[in-house]
Amino acid sequence: MLRQTYEDLHRHPELSGEEHRTAALVSSRLRDLGMQVHEGVGGTGVVGVLVNGTGPTVLLRADMDALPVTEDTGLPYTSTVPGVMHACGHDLHVVCLLGAAQELTAIRQAWSGTLVLLFQPAEETVSGAAAMVADGLFDEVPVPDVVLGQH
């Protein structure tokens, strides 16, 4: 399922601040895993929270936006959006974080604490993280003890 999700996201890239389809897919997957989901944080950001007893709060982050670049790779799952592609791998970052969510929820008996999964919009325009914080991110979710991000 993760490979299919990757290929789907790669086919449907979205520019900074326009990650509506990606955000909807992420929200749906997180809900399916039983996570509390916060949508529209900082525009199109999504945050999933899983409280699993006492312990540290760990935030894992991935970016979601694509670049204004025409794809000419010949891949069978090439971008279907003219002039837009996931040239930086943010589609893969999203899938890796969804995979981590799958695994960590499946083995929740092996760990204790709070897991926060942050899917950041608008990384390429350097505005998404600030927008999420300004939108009250930490009024909605616990302040993390540890942050691990992909890029």
Give the residues covered by each predicted segment.
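Acidic/histidine-rich catalytic neighborhood of metal-dependent amide-processing enzymes
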Residues: 92-151
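Acidic/His- and Gly-rich active-site-bordering loop/insert found
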Residues: 1-86, 91, 95-112
